[in-house]
């Protein structure tokens, strides 16, 4: 039996800002169901966690965490949910705030969390054989685990969810936050800054990321965000494991957010669309396909490409709904287009999970023209709700969506290769052509219905990673 301790900055169902929370919430349970492992999870006790959860947490103890020359108190709480044990690290100064990211001292906050992770190993009723850390917020914990060796022969795995977020801090924080010799600086420093993500990459026994294609991409300058050379040097220890989704949660047959549940019947999608349009004020047009974007409105998501071609595509007989928020420039743009095309487009700038699910259940197509996408969640959800993804060939989008071939009848969506607006427009018009041919559309939808990406496959791949990293295969120097 292997004992795995996940350390993460967010985790469903307690706190979520993005896909990291879904991984941290779903993968541990899938790993336990795979067998041969007990997986526990540790995360900060944020003020933002709902009181209905916090009232159930069991206080374990308080302990002292050294942050350079300072000493801070950490409180340890424990909770068991769906057969998984969760630990929460509390500190009023660092975690009693509105939201969980975006503060000037985020680096310090998650150095504290990383120090607390290592210190807490003395107080939890669990001796991990593997410490599995996620993203820059816990990269320092991987470094400290290797330096301090709090548990004999503790193996470390570090997962990169998005390499563009690296948790950098001024070089002076090395002396301010750590009681370490200067010989350890090289493993944390990058470009005259302390780099939390680099710290995890440098010290981990195994490095994973969230899709096979993304693992290849981050070895190149275009995607590597400055760390490609270091990753190239460790490429033998880098593996891409595709994320999954919870197929019980994202199930249109039982989803309580939907006014009309369904398995595969196309007519049920139209019923959902009719009710959705009544709610948001868009006129239903028979035979007109609905395209949706459920996304953050930021450059990474390919919004610049959409800006260049949207008005031309809106000349076609289609409708579009955009759900998401982000950069003001993009928010203003979509609201302006909505104003000028009121019968064809609606923009909803406040993300709402229930509305997102109703969009998936009503739409024909999901558009994801991402500049880069480590794995992607929306395209996997779309497939579950019988909605056809249109994606750029990058990261997990390339690994999960196969371009439809009208000759062979293979494929579960549409793809374009280059980050180019003309290619995007071409594939959008091609998707409309296929939609307008019922025999081809029927073949495509059958393929979509067969596409399943559960956590079961991800758990099996991670179990193999843990198994490979036995005590004889890693260095503890």
UniProtKB/Swiss-Prot annotation:
**In Gene Ontology terms, what is a biological process of this protein?**
glycogen biosynthetic process
Q: Which Pfam families match?
A: Glyco_transf_5 (PF08323), Glycos_transf_1 (PF00534)
Quote the EC number: 2.4.1.21
Concerning InterPro entries, the annotation shows: Glyco_trans_1, GS/SS, Starch_synth_cat_dom
* UniProt similarity note: Belongs to the glycosyltransferase 1 family. Bacterial/plant glycogen synthase subfamily.
Return the HAMAP family for the record: Glycogen_synth (MF_00484)
Name listed for the protein in its UniProt record:
Glycogen synthase
Q: What is the lineage of its organism?
A: Bacteria, Bacillati, Bacillota, Bacilli, Bacillales
């Amino acid at each position: 039996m292997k004992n795995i301790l996940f350390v993460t900055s967010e985790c469903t169902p307690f706190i979520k800002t993005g896909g990291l929370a879904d991984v941290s919430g779903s993968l541990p349970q899938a790993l336990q169901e795979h067998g041969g492992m007990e997986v526990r999870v540790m995360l900060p006790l944020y003020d933002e966690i709902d009181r209905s959860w916090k009232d159930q947490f069991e206080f374990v103890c308080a302990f002292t965490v050294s942050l350079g020359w300072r000493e801070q108190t950490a409180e340890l709480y424990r909770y068991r949910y769906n057969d998984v044990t969760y630990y929460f690290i509390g500190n009023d100064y660092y975690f009693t705030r509105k939201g969980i990211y975006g503060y000037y001292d985020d680096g310090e906050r998650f150095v504290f969390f990383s120090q607390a992770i290592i210190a807490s190993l003395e107080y939890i009723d669990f001796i991990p054989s593997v410490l599995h850390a996620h993203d820059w917020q816990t990269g320092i914990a991987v470094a400290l685990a290797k330096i301090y060796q709090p548990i004999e022969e503790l193996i470390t795995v570090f997962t990169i969810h998005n390499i563009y977020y690296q948790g950098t801090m001024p070089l002076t924080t090395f002396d301010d936050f750590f009681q370490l010799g200067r010989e350890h600086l090289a493993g944390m420093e990058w470009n005259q800054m302390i780099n939390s993500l680099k710290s995890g990459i440098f010290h981990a026994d195994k490095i994973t990321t969230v899709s096979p294609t993304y693992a290849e991409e981050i070895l190149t300058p275009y995607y590597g965000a400055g760390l490609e050379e270091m990753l190239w040097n460790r490429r033998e220890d880098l593996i891409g494991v595709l994320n999954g989704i919870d197929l019980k949660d994202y199930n249109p047959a039982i989803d309580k957010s939907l006014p009309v549940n369904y398995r595969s019947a196309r007519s049920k999608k139209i019923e959902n669309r009719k009710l959705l349009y009544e709610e948001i004020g868009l006129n239903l047009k028979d035979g007109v396909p609905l395209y949706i974007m459920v996304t953050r409105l930021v450059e990474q998501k390919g919004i610049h490409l959409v800006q260049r071609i949207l008005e031309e595509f809106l000349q076609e007989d289609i409708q579009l709904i955009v759900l998401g928020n982000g950069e003001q420039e993009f928010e203003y743009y979509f609201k302006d287009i909505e104003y000028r095309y009121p019968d064809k487009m609606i923009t909803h700038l406040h993300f709402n999970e229930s509305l997102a699910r109703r969009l998936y259940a009503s739409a024909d197509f999901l558009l994801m023209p991402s500049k880069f996408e480590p794995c992607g969640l929306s395209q996997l959800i779309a497939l579950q709700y019988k909605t056809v993804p249109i994606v750029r060939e990058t990261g997990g989008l390339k690994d999960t969506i196969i371009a439809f071939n009208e000759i062979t009848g293979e494929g579960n969506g549409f793809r374009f290769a280059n980050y180019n607006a003309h290619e995007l427009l071409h594939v959008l018009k091609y998707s409309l052509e296929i939609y307008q041919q019922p025999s081809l559309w029927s073949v495509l939808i059958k393929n979509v219905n067969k596409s399943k990406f559960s956590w079961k496959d991800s758990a099996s791949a991670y179990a193999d990673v843990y198994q490979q990293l036995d005590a004889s295969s890693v260095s503890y120097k």
